[in-house]
């Protein structure tokens, strides 16, 4: 890297700061960019610039958006009675790709993890409290995963909601054996939850 021209070296250093890109991968990417027409590299530069200047968090749900409130929050076809809690924006994107959920969202901005210094005040619980105070939410769906941190977060939020809004139903995503899997390959906890939450045929 010492013999690289300064502009190339500077770009490689910046690219290698991205997750999953080491110096060699960053150099390959930079060399690819050098082969692009100048108009394309300028377009890429503008897109990166616009990303920082034009994106912000939706004041209602916490999603990344270029308008506030976001398109999901303002969509009249979505039910305001169901509020799905997710830890991060990528979980919202995954649920949206499925096309089966027609309620609204709230992004918590993480999960409770005291060992990592992530406590309740680190989460978007004020935003949740405001949404609940509006009085339209009838069900809160916890779509947080099954890690210890997710379980702790779900329990904490459930207790908070039940205490303040006992009429609101609190649910979680079903857990169990994934589609296409065999029982003999499942871990004990997955089997336990599958048995506990079994369904009628």
UniProtKB/Swiss-Prot annotation:
GO molecular function terms listed in the Swiss-Prot or TrEMBL record: DNA binding; zinc ion binding
Any Pfam family hit: Toprim_4
Domain of life per record: Bacteria
Keywords, comma-separated and alphabetical: DNA damage, DNA recombination, DNA repair, Metal-binding, Zinc, Zinc-finger
Coiled coil, from the record: none
Domain (Toprim): residue spans on this chain: 81-178
Zinc fingers, C4-type class: 58-73
Cross-referenced InterPro entries: DNA_Rcmb_RecR, Rcmb_RecR, Rcmb_RecR_Znf, TOPRIM_dom, TOPRIM_RecR
GO biological-process terms attached to the record: DNA recombination; DNA repair
Keyword Metal-binding set for record: yes
PANTHER family cross-referenced by the UniProt entry: RECOMBINATION PROTEIN RECR
Purpose: May play a role in DNA repair. It seems to be involved in an RecBC-independent recombinational process of DNA repair. It may act with RecF and RecO.
Similarity comment text for this entry: Belongs to the RecR family.
NCBIfam families reported for this sequence: recR
Protein name: Recombination protein RecR
Organism classification: Bacteria, Pseudomonadati, Thermodesulfobacteriota, Desulfovibrionia, Desulfovibrionales
